[in-house]
UniProtKB/Swiss-Prot annotation:
Protein name: Probable ribonuclease P/MRP protein subunit POP5
GO BP annotation list: tRNA 5'-leader removal
Gene symbol of the encoding locus: pop5
GO molecular function per UniProt: ribonuclease P activity; ribonuclease P RNA binding
Chief location: nucleus
């Protein structure tokens, strides 16, 4: 029995004009990619891997999608996606986030990438709190006077008790 080897390409669609961007969907992506591959690489190349081309996952909020293609043709698809520069006059760019042999590897890569982005949002929240800004339930920004007391260390013995506090600084 022959094992079919596939590659899963996790790709991000970057719209350079957000006002003219389109909502991603399975059918739109499949049609658009099919037409662009025919135009960029030729109909013969497209026909060679058309049967193995499948959209596995689409997230319109993050503009991320996972596409499956046969191992033999994943470099051709990667090349075609790289060559796409516009969608009806709107500048567009496909960024290859991860190439893997299974969906599980793509999921792990997505968790790793989005985990870093989530920590950036937490950092912004911390910076807002340091400035004394708060956001209420209606997403209104309120500025409160920030009171920073440096004398807390002096009350607790100055924080100079000879112990290293590096264990508290771990990520």
């Amino acid at each position: 029995m022959v094992r079919l080897k596939n590659r899963y390409l996790m790709t991000e669609v970057i719209w350079h004009d957000n006002e003219k961007s389109t909502q991603l969907s399975d059918s739109w992506l499949f049609q658009f990619i099919s037409n662009e591959v025919k135009e960029k690489l030729g109909e013969l190349t497209y026909e060679a891997f058309k049967k193995t081309l499948k959209i596995i996952y689409v997230n319109p909020d993050t503009n991320i999608f996972i596409i499956r293609v046969s191992f033999e043709y994943y470099k051709s698809l990667w090349t075609a996606l790289t060559l796409i520069t516009s969608y009806y006059g709107v500048p567009i760019y496909f960024r290859m986030v991860h190439v893997g042999g299974s969906i599980r590897l793509c999921q792990k890569a997505a968790i790793k990438i989005f985990g870093k982005q989530i920590s950036v949002y937490d950092k912004n929240k911390i910076l807002r709190n340091e400035k004394g800004e708060t956001i209420d339930n209606n997403n209104n920004k309120n500025e409160e006077p920030s009171i920073k007391m440096d004398s807390d260390d002096d009350e607790n013995g100055g924080g100079d008790d000879g112990e290293d506090n590096d264990s508290e600084m771990k990520d």
